Amino acid sequence: ARIPLSSLNPEIERITAGKPHLYVLNKSDLADPEITRQWLAYFKSAGAGCIAMDSKQRGRATATKGLIEKELSALMERRRSRGMVGAAIRVMIVGIPNVGKSTFINSFAGTTRAKAANKPGVTRGKQWISVDSFDLMDMPGVLWKKFDSLETASNLAFIGSIRDDILDIEELACGLLSSVRGIYPQQLLARYKLDAEALTLPPYDLLQAIGAKRGMLISGGEVDTERAAKMLVGEFRASKWGRLSLERPPRRAIQEDREEVTDDAPQDDDWDDEQ
């Protein structure tokens, strides 16, 4: 829910073009509620099914069952007309790493059915999980080969969808400070007990100031910036700064993007045979 646009995988959009979609803004408990409402309105105005939730709340994902059936109403009607009553509805749960897909499935099922953890790469292979009249496919998180912008790559790294061990943690922390101080300055000031002038510092100097405030010093009184960076990124991901959203809805409608993708993609006129 904190980066709805950056987390939208264009390859998945291309592959699934023409098929029913339901966008789940998961981990909404970490996002700015007002911005999340704007995103819901944005998707709704484009005619796209969308729901915001915190899948850690047991049973919360069951609210999506009715929405899934709504998105698949045409398919279900075709099945009924062909006498295919009682056939399971197949749903693919797909998204980038570390957005709570397995947690969503466990909430949907009302019990632990998929292994989940707050880090990328926990789900290693696809598996089918049956829940009532639904067959859910749990899949590993998928990133695409080339990001369209540095902002997209940075946002994915900020929330932990890219493994930290391949990143420069200090550079990541400085990028996060640059992004957040312009949209949520008061949260930074309050969390790290800074004065307003600190926000005018270059990002690395601001990181040092935060490390000094937390007493993260090494011999000679210098700030341990690596330790400070790990702390800062970890606290952001754990929502210790408050409920923050890094993206606002863009002006162009999502429907325009999906229509462009659909024009280039092969159509599946008999989707119900597979789904």
Please state what every model-predicted region is.
Residues 60, 100, 135:
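Short phosphate-engaging motifs
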